[in-house]
Design a protein with these regions (language model features):
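Active-site anion/phosphate-binding pocket segments in diverse small-molecule metabolic enzymes
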Residues: 1-125
Length: 125
């Protein structure tokens, strides 16, 4: 298994952590209880379930549109994101997400170990 995405059963695959994420940036934080990011359906795929916000248990992600995502805060969020903050979302379905990008960054800890080209980018029919 190269990736474990959000759609795979967390209990069945508990030996593996999710390894495919999309890095997104907060664009709007003016409304209470939510923030807007620059990763919508075109960045994370329209397939459901929606992505999971990495490291955040009391927040949910919804696609606001093709270009924008909505981060919804629960009752006890660990933080409130501000404009410019970066966060990772664990995508729900790997194949269509990988197909959307020209390259992928292989990261271990905080270090980028490799940049892999995606030569079949956009080749799905």
């Amino acid at each position: 298994m190269l990736f474990r995405s959000g759609e795979q059963d967390l209990e069945v695959y508990s030996d593996f952590a999710a390894s495919l994420t999309v890095l997104t940036t907060v664009l709007n934080d003016q409304y209470e209880g939510r923030a807007t990011s620059d990763a919508g359906a075109k960045a994370c795929t329209i397939n459901q379930p929606w992505p999971i916000i990495k490291g955040e248990s009391d927040m949910t992600y919804r696609s606001g549109s093709d270009e924008f995502g909505t981060i919804l805060y629960g009752d006890n969020p660990s933080r409130n994101y501000k404009v410019g903050d970066k966060l990772e979302v664990i995508v729900s379905h790997c194949d269509p997400v990988v197909n959307l990008y020209d390259q992928m960054y292989a990261i271990r800890g905080d270090k980028v170990e490799a940049v892999w080209p995606i030569s079949a980018r956009g080749m799905s029919a």
